[in-house]
């Protein structure tokens, strides 16, 4: 057996990694990096089939500010482009995203998943067959205690398609535990849990390509 390939050997603590196919038989890896001490940042690396890193040694910084940047989630878009999202901040946190190709960062600055001024956390991502990316997060704009599950669609150019996000459940009950899969026509299929124990139901919704349902 092999001994493995070091993705990062710089000082500090690294965790919360994510790995996805990146096109051209490459892999995209991102992680939370504490090389600057208590300040958490997001770094990434691409590996070719020979397990060679294609970015700079110890990784390319994606989010490197004085804020805490954690919870990276990645997926493949198309060609050699990857999508990554993460949480910025601790209390009043926000969700941001970026495209990364084989040359590095695609956007000059990271993009917010929503312009609505609310606390955002707990993102998940999936792509569909055409490379559109769907992002789920917990948003506290209407429910400050438990939050609600919101969704955003990002097209292959990196532009948001669903405004400030689509709230999947308009009921006043608690909603949580969403799992989702992109459809063939730009739509999204979502299942989630509604209610509180012991009265919990499994719900389903199809969000159409334009964000309606």
Indicate where each model-derived feature is located.
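Extracellular, repeat-based ectodomains that mediate carbohydrate processing or recognition
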Residues: 1-213
């Amino acid at each position: 057996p092999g001994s493995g390939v070091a993705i990062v050997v710089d000082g500090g603590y690294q965790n919360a990694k994510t790995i996805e196919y990146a096109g051209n038989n490459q892999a995209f890896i991102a992680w939370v990096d504490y090389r600057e001490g208590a300040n958490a940042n997001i770094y990434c690396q691409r590996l070719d089939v020979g397990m060679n890193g294609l970015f700079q040694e110890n990784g390319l910084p994606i989010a490197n500010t004085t804020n805490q940047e954690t919870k990276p989630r990645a997926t493949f878009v198309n060609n050699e482009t990857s999508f990554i999202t993460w949480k910025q901040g601790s209390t009043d946190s926000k969700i941001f995203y970026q495209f990364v190709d084989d040359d590095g960062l695609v956007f000059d600055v990271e993009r917010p998943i929503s312009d609505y001024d609310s606390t955002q956390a707990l993102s998940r991502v999936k792509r569909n067959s055409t490379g559109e990316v769907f992002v789920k997060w917990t948003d506290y704009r209407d429910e400050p205690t438990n939050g609600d599950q919101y969704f955003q669609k990002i097209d292959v150019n990196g532009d948001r398609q669903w405004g400030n996000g689509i709230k999947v459940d308009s009921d006043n009950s608690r909603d949580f535990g969403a799992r989702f899969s992109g459809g063939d026509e730009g739509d999204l299929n979502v299942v989630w849990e509604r209610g509180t124990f012991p009265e919990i139901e499994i719900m389903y919704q199809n969000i159409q390509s334009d964000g309606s349902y």
